């Protein structure tokens, strides 16, 4: 289905990151793999940025041009971040802005 960039026209890829549950140290390898599939022109990280646990993402978002999306924890046991990512993914696909996704 997907081919390497050298064998095809450029695909637009969106990288959506669940920053509440993912270690930022893996971002380099993820972007390397996605770059072989297309151009990662949408980069978003979702989470509750008021939490100390997400402070480690600060330098990473700046270095890699990742746009932080604030998602408050309104209820316990529900994952609002997952829902926000899902809604944005469907919206991006519907608008025709992307050809594929990288989900972290």
Where are the model-predicted features located?
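Domain-level signal for Mg2+-assisted phosphodiester chemistry and nucleotide/NA-binding surfaces
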Residues: 2-99
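Active-site histidine-anchored catalytic micro-motif
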Residues: 104
């Amino acid at each position: 289905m997907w081919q390497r960039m050298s064998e095809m026209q450029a695909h637009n890829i969106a990288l959506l990151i669940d920053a509440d549950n993912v270690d930022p140290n893996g971002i380099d390898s993820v972007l390397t793999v996605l770059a072989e599939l297309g151009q990662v022109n949408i980069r978003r990280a979702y989470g509750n940025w008021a939490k100390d646990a997400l402070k480690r993402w600060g330098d990473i978002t700046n270095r890699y041009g990742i746009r932080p999306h604030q998602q408050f924890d309104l209820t316990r046991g529900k994952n609002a971040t997952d829902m926000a990512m899902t809604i944005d993914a469907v919206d991006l696909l519907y608008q025709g802005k992307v050809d594929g996704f990288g989900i972290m």
